[in-house]
Amino acid sequence: MLYVLLILAVLIAGILIVASTKPNTVHYERSSVINAPPEKIVPHLIDFHKWEAWSPWDKLEPDMKRSYSGAANGVGAKYAWEGKKKAGAGSMAITEVNSHGVKVDLRYIKPWKAECIARFHFTPQPNGTDVRWSMDGPNTFMGKVFGLFMNMDKLVGKDFEIGLAGLKTAVEKG
């Protein structure tokens, strides 16, 4: 029995040591070309009411509680959500809009607390606009441990890819 406990203690210590070497910040990013100029894309990003048409997280729990405050759109627009199972809870605020993109401050409450910055950056292309969606934030110790067992870039990146595909559809059909 003592031998099993010793092995377990060594495994836990190893996991904690490896986790402590992971970066203190995270960065996730995906991009997609949308067949439209930035001025056609921006309205879908600066009005949180329009996010329901393309956001991957809105589809997790279509009946989640939503609230909107601040400006109707653009800088100062705010959105909060509270899901019962999958979507968690948090809030977003648009803090910057310019010809190169949109910046959104995110505050997660559930399933864990975190503050991140999401950016939508526009790069003109011959056939439209390359929209790069990125998110940067702190990598907590528990996040580092979790990251040892789950590929967070793959998980978050998949959501970004789904969201960008939905945004592309919303803009191009718009």
Predicted feature locations:
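Conserved short-loop catalytic and cofactor-binding motifs
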Residues: E29, S67, E82, L148-N151
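Solvent-exposed, acidic/flexible segments
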Residues: I34, H44, A87, D153, ...
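Hydrophobic pocket/interface hotspot
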Residues: K40-W51, Y79, I94, V104, ...
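Hydrophobic ligand-binding cavity/cleft-lining segments
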Residues: Y3-A71
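Extracytoplasmic ligand-binding sensor domains of the Cache superfamily
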Residues: N73-G76
